[in-house]
Amino acid sequence: MPGAGTFKLFIGNLDEKTQATELRALFEKYGTVVECDVVKNYGFVHMETEQQGRDAIQNLNGYTLNEFAIKVEAAKSRRAPNTPTTKIFVGNLTDKTRAPEVRELFQKYGTVVECDIVRNYGFVHLDCVGDVQDAIKELNGRVVDGQPLKVQVSTSRVRPKPGMGDPEQCYRCGRSGHWSKECPRLYGSAGGGREPPSPLSAGGYRDRMYGRDPYPPPPPPPPFLRDRIMDGFRDYDYYDRRFEDSRDLYERRYQTSRMRDFPPPPISRREPMPLPPTLSGSLRSCSVSRGYDTMFSRRSPPPPRSSNGMSRYGSPTPHGYEDFSRDAFDERMISSRGMRGPSPPGRRYAPY
């Protein structure tokens, strides 16, 4: 088991057929190998001292083993606190420049904890104990492989790769508090885009379950069509229409005479029935009272019977039928035409 004073190295980009014995034999050239383990396409090597490990990194990083260029660097313990370092950006590199060359340039100014090359630029993590300002001042503009280097302190933040952080965090931006489908990056938060939907809004959780947007409400109908539709549902009473207009008595009674098929108004809406008027032989004797319904006709009292059972018109009156005088017929005709006139005092109905 490796002791606490060993220097642990990480070896990446290994061939799956690479054995631990091959890796141990490769690193024993630079010092004592305390332990060597291979896990699929990467492994770990524990060197006896830090200096032996630095020598192995400088010589074996980028070395071709089983047709694969291996990556050798100091392993970072997740339990132990990281060594404070300064991240330096190195730009304007050529395709021929390798990480060992860049590492060798910075080793003069302190311990190089990590050195990575990404296409035409790279990053160097230099121990804070070293002289970072001198390294930037002297190496900025130095020509390497025919191109001047650009060296400065890196301003980028170390961010986890999408999907590799906390499972409760958004895999697009690495932040918590929202789902990946509501990430501000999708809606252009910096460019004045539309706002992401709220999870508490109507249909928010339903959209998350089914993955589709809710159907929008239908547009309202045009004003003229809406008025036409609403007119069909308005409840008008015949008697309300009869009394709401400002027509005169003649027109109202004319309309009433044309619509005799309708039933009489409710009792609560009827006006009190006036006393029966007196009868007269002339047309002026007819009195039409306001509110009197013309559907019911007044009848005159039966004439006095003669001793021989004959009516005043000379025809016999059969039993079971009642006589109607011409005065009652005239009154019905005048009432339907709307004629008005006061009734002079005269004789009233005879008691039945």
Swiss-Prot record:
Its main location: cytoplasm. A zinc finger (CCHC-type) spans 168-185. One of its GO terms (cellular component) is cytoplasm. Changing residue 170 to Y: Defects in sensory bristle formation and wing shape, and oogenesis. It comes from the Eukaryota. GO terms for molecular function: mRNA binding; RNA binding; zinc ion binding. Residues 187-228, 254-352 are annotated as: Disordered. It is found in: Cytoplasm; Nucleus. Residues 214-224, 262-277 have a biased composition (Pro residues). Expressed in the CNS and in CCAP neurons of the ventral nervous system (VNS), which control insect ecdysis. Residues 279-288 have a biased composition (Polar residues). Residues 320-334 have a biased composition (Basic and acidic residues). SUPFAM superfamilies: RNA-binding domain, RBD (SSF54928). Keywords: Biological rhythms, Cytoplasm, Metal-binding, Nucleus, Phosphoprotein, Repeat, RNA-binding, Zinc, Zinc-finger. Essential RNA-binding protein. May be required for circadian repression of eclosion. Also essential for nurse cell dumping during oogenesis, the process whereby the cytoplasmic contents of nurse cells are transferred to the oocyte late in it's development. PANTHER family: OS02G0815200 PROTEIN (PTHR48025), RRM DOMAIN-CONTAINING PROTEIN (PTHR48025:SF1). This is RNA-binding protein lark. It comes from Drosophila melanogaster (Fruit fly). The lineage of its organism: Eukaryota, Metazoa, Ecdysozoa, Arthropoda, Hexapoda.
